[in-house]
């Protein structure tokens, strides 16, 4: 890789790192919704732009490790799950681009997979932390509210989870 492209890759890596550290830190600190959706979208754009500069083996994983290092130094209060998300995204993207599939298809796969990984990670963590009973309790709570307004009982969590996953999937397509 020539010096010009190396400089661009370093700048893109810095952009990714500082978006993870600063924007991610702010979103996590204020517990704002859709943190993973926003940060994953930015990560995908940065990773794809890095690959666009002429992908070489190990390039994305090196950028990922650098992003993790900067994120840990600047925003140490970030939950461990955020670091896991970045590492999984970087490793998966490295794998997809390493396969040598056509660039446009790789970008499409990377975008959808990164956003879906973010969605599933959140759902898995909620289930592990609160158990399956969490979803039953949510249904019970939402049905009690619905009954007050004269609506029947429905498994609302199924619809909420489906909406959440579809939102991430659609953003993955758009990104």
Task: Name what the model sees in each region.
Residues 26, 30, 100, 127-128:
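Helix-loop junctions at the membrane-solvent interface of multi-pass transporters
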Residues 2-6, 56, 101, 106, ...:
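General structural signal for secondary-structure boundaries
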Residues 48-55, 72-80, 95-103, 119-126:
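Juxtamembrane membrane-interface segments at transmembrane alpha-helix termini
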Residues 64-66, 82-87:
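"Short basic amphipathic alpha-helical interaction patches in structured regions
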Residues 16-24, 43, 47, 67, ...:
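Alpha-helical transmembrane segments of multipass membrane proteins
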Residues 107-175:
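Membrane-embedded alpha-helical hairpins and interfacial helices in multi-pass inner-membrane proteins
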Residues 2, 12, 16, 84-123:
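Short helix-perturbing small/polar motifs within transmembrane alpha-helices
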Residues 2-73, 77-78:
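Hydrophobic transmembrane alpha-helices
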